[in-house]
Amino acid sequence: MNTENKEITSNWFTNLRDLLCKEFEKIEEKYAQIKGLKPAKFVRTSWKRNGGGCGIMSLMKGEVFEKVGVNISTVFGEFSQEFRSEILGAELDGKFFATGISVVAHLKSPLIPAMHFNTRYIETSKNWFGGGSDLTPFYPEENETAKFHTAFKEACDKYDSSYYPKFKRQCDEYFYLRHRKEPRGVGGIFYDYLNSGNFEQDFAFTRDIGKALLSVYPEIVRSKLFLPWTDEQKEYQLIKRGRYVEFNLLYDRGTKFGLMTDGNIEAILMSLPPVVKFN
């Protein structure tokens, strides 16, 4: 396993965490200033993994972001025998290293889309990058969806013109609730097992995916910051959030990986919405 690669990837995810938290806090500050409220701030909680590694969960519950979490973690050790066959390159000795960032935002306003993002670097006897981002609006708008997709398409096209259509298709296939036969949202990109043979290029691509999120999602939130909504719209949001819960508990790879590696339960389940209704 490459020590330098582990260090620089972990450092980037920490840096991206700081940039995102700062941007989200600025949005809360702006809203609080106009409304005469005290702005919410992120609360950070550190955790350690018994088998090796640690993480930091940053959580903010405010007036704009009903719940937004930004998790970073770096964990290592050995998979148990029962899981080794499920992870690429872990079949022989089960050793692994994983570092990454995971972001999930649930907004109070039903007019502002929920967002999920994660990028990660994993080493076993193999090594690869993975990640992506998707948008879940409760009241989809074509222009907003196009803006979100364009940001990630531009990041992809810098490296390979085949990336965006491939990763968009993978996102559509991945974020699909098979038991309901419906998509979770309006998509985005999703990639896994990315190893072109050029670590520097793959790492640069993963950094640019993070920068794409930073450029587009805060802008979407700000554009709808002061739009009024109705009780009926809020009720619909709470019901649709149930789909989010179903996906994360039934299909999400990150949730499964966290449980397989004995990760922090609060951090693993951070992605769940704060309030949900099931009808």
From Swiss-Prot:
Pathway of action: Porphyrin-containing compound metabolism; protoporphyrin-IX biosynthesis; protoporphyrinogen-IX from coproporphyrinogen-III (O2 route): step 1/1
Enzyme Commission (EC) number: 1.3.3.3
Keyword Metal-binding among UniProt keywords: yes
Reactions this protein catalyses: coproporphyrinogen III + O2 + 2 H(+) = protoporphyrinogen IX + 2 CO2 + 2 H2O
GO molecular function: coproporphyrinogen oxidase activity; metal ion binding; protein homodimerization activity
Compartments, record wording: Cytoplasm
Keyword Amino-acid biosynthesis tagged: no
Cofactor or coenzyme needed: a divalent metal cation
Gene3D superfamilies xref list: Coproporphyrinogen III oxidase, aerobic
Active site: 116
GO terms of biological process kind: protoporphyrinogen IX biosynthetic process
NCBIfam families: PRK05330.1 (NF003727)
Family per similarity comment: Belongs to the aerobic coproporphyrinogen-III oxidase family.
UniProt protein name: Oxygen-dependent coproporphyrinogen-III oxidase
Organism whose genome encodes this protein: Rickettsia typhi (strain ATCC VR-144 / Wilmington)
Gene designation: hemF
